[in-house]
């Protein structure tokens, strides 16, 4: 076959992240005594800025895990311990497992032909809890989490770790994130199958070998001769 292994993103590729994130934040804010209708958007603005800093290499995942809540609590003039709040959020989000359409059947089908390695910038405790609650765990050959290995997508080093000796030219990255999955794979010399269900435009300077709107389409791509 053309490829010897598949790398797959998790959030917004296999799991529908935002609904679970919204629910976890709503539960957390209720515990903090905050009930403004704009509270999620206020938190999300801070969270997004931290994730952008991570993709620029200015912050690691462990720092992000706490820093977003440190900034949020400061903005709200709350004296709660940001580490405690971050850990509670991780517990709540770890309970939210919402697979995207065809995610489970696609990973299962891929795993019958190729090793499937999950590659994520997520928080270790969150991703491990979510994966433990998903049948996807039975079909993957491994999971590389940025917080555990000390580098994050789009750093090509995390791709090298995930490949574990496989030539980058023999691997396929399947993911939705242009600033993480696509850019990182481009830098690492790995072909990209861009999962783009909303038909977004590809940012200038990036390239993909394949573009799909339905996860099932990646099976024929990954297993081509």
Describe the function of each predicted region:
Residues 2-101:
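N-terminal helical cap/lid subdomain that shapes the substrate entry/recognition surface
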Residues 57, 95, 116, 169-170:
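A generic structural signal for short
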Residues 102-113:
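Catalytic-core regions built around general acid/base machinery
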């Amino acid at each position: 076959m053309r490829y010897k292994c598949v790398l797959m993103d998790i959030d917004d590729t296999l799991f529908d992240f935002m609904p679970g994130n919204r629910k976890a934040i709503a539960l957390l804010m209720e515990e903090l005594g905050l009930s403004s209708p704009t509270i999620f958007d206020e938190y999300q603005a801070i969270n997004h800025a931290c994730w952008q800093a991570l993709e620029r290499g200015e912050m690691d995942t462990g720092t992000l895990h706490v820093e977003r809540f440190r900034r949020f609590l400061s903005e709200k003039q709350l004296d709660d311990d940001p580490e405690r709040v971050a850990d509670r959020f991780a517990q709540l989000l770890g309970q939210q497992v919402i697979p995207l359409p065809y995610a489970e059947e696609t990973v299962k089908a891929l795993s019958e032909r190729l090793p499937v390695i999950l590659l994520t910038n997520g928080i270790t405790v969150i991703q491990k809890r979510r994966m433990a609650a998903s049948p996807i765990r039975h079909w993957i050959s491994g999971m590389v989490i940025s917080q555990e290995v000390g580098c994050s997508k789009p750093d090509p080093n995390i791709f090298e770790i995930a490949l574990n000796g496989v030539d980058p030219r023999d691997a396929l990255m399947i993911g939705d994130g242009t600033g993480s999955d696509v850019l990182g794979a481009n830098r690492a010399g790995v072909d990209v199958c861009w999962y783009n269900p909303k038909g977004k435009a590809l940012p200038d300077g990036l390239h993909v070998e394949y573009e799909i709107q339905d996860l099932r389409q990646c099976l024929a791509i990954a297993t081509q001769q």
